[in-house]
Amino acid sequence: MRLWFCLSFFIVLCLEHFTGTLADERNVPESEEKTEQFLRDLPKINRKGPRPPGFSPFRGKFHSQSLRDLPKINRKGPRPPGFSPFRGKFHSQSLRDLPKINRKGPRPPGFSPFRGKFHSQSLRDLPKINRKGPRPPGFSPFRGKFHSQSLRDLPKINRKGPRPPGFSPFRGKFHSQSLRDLPKINRKGPRPPGFSPFRGKFHSQSLRDLPKINRKGPRPPGFSPFRGKFHSQSLRDLPKINRKGPRPPGFSPFRGKFHSQSLRDMYEIKQYKTAHGRPPICAPGEQCPIWVGK
């Protein structure tokens, strides 16, 4: 019995020594052995089918391999698939960081605080967005793209040529930008082109509201119930009106202007008379002082 025990103990010691020697000769840790197995399996992996954990279908390799390659990638040159030149890392890394990003604080390049995701994700979602249905924040139904894309295109747009939908040739920017600037505009001070101080909004907004305005009910400032349009539109049409031919409603062929303009001039004259008295009546042949409105 004692002999059998000693013999079995000797065999166990020999086996441990033998396997340890083999491992020392190969000098390969267990984790690297697994990596070697994965590398041998790469050609057999179907990117569209079930994948082993840690495998990226975009790059056709494992994440650990990609991370080791980061310092060698040139952002301005050819890049491996799934690499973002804006962030200097792969999309899969960025997606894992999303919950940690503060929209109101410092943000990594390429991150949109409006959508809470990276631009590259949003661009992939464009074909799935319904312009007439619920839309993700920062998406413009007029242009069919996100505002951040449109802002990058501004220098390339020709104001006098074909323009993308939602672009204002008067302001050289998109309507959505102008609407965000409304609270900062001073009606009595310098105003951006296309802004109406009477209505406190841009002309393009007012034109879209025309079908909803009731001529007999409350009307927005600057709207003429006679013409069914705003005064600023009518003033632009003055040179095209023929006094002797058909005329738009509210136009006076005697004065060559609209009645609403004349009423505003009467009000200014009345204010002048109240402040300075009646303009003096001059004798024939004398030069009278010219009245200048307020």
UniProtKB/Swiss-Prot annotation:
Signal peptide coordinates: 1-23
Main location: secreted
A GO term, aspect molecular function: hormone activity
Keyword Signal assigned: yes
This protein's UniProt keywords: Amidation, Amphibian defense peptide, Cleavage on pair of basic residues, Disulfide bond, G-protein coupled receptor impairing toxin, Repeat, Secreted, Signal, Toxin, Vasoactive, Vasodilator
Segments of this protein annotated with the region Disordered: 28-230, 238-257
Cystine crosslinks: C282-C288
Modified residues (Valine amide): V292
Subcellular location: Secreted
Family annotation (InterPro entries): Bradykinin (IPR009608)
Tissue: Expressed by the skin glands.
Domain of life: Eukaryota
Gene Ontology biological process terms in this record: defense response; eating behavior; vasodilation
Repeat is among the record's keywords: yes
Compositional bias per record (Basic and acidic residues), positions renumbered to this chain: 28-44
Gene Ontology CC terms, in alphabetical order: extracellular region
Pfam families: Bradykinin
Family designation: Belongs to the bradykinin-related peptide family.
UniProt protein name: Kininogen-1a
